[in-house]
Amino acid sequence: QGKRLFLRFEGANSIADVFINRRHIGEHRGGYGAFVFEITGEVNYGKENSILVRVNNGEQLDVMPLVGDFNFYGGIYRDVHLLITDEACISPLNYASPGVRLIQDSVSHQYGKIRAVVDLANGNNAGQEVELGIRLLDGQKVVAQQKQTLTLAGNAALQQELTFEI
């Protein structure tokens, strides 16, 4: 308790319905992309819980690809992970991304400008102060680093951007 729980599927083909303790928590359509569902509010702490994943790999005209030069295998064919985070965390809910994107705005042999865009989320009703820190490394050497302290409103999500010029 006091943590957030996410199920991250790396691949299930082609329509996956996920149930926690017999309650439907979501559907994912598409066989080749990762997807995440938050299950925090569905878990019975201190008791046995069940996870059921029903996957349909029958032909679906609205789910790509429809044809290919490979076999269309069904079911869960890649790893599934249980992610456990603090209530305020880097969110995995943006299309199952790791929650951090690096954007190279300008790069040359002498100069680089890089933006780090971080998806933050607070799963608590109360606002929380968090510290966001990023270090850019060249091998073992720290090239640049930044830290920011910010307040996340209760049950809120935001994107925070840090810019590095090196």
Protein language model features and the residues they cover:
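Accessory beta-strand-rich segments of carbohydrate-active enzymes
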Residues: Q1-L93, S97-P98, G123-N124, K141
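Beta-strand-rich binding/interaction modules
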Residues: I20, Q110-T151, L158-L162
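A generic structural motif
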Residues: G31, L83, T149-L150, F164
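Short strand-edge motifs at loop-to-beta-strand transitions and within beta-strands
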Residues: G33-F37, A156-F164
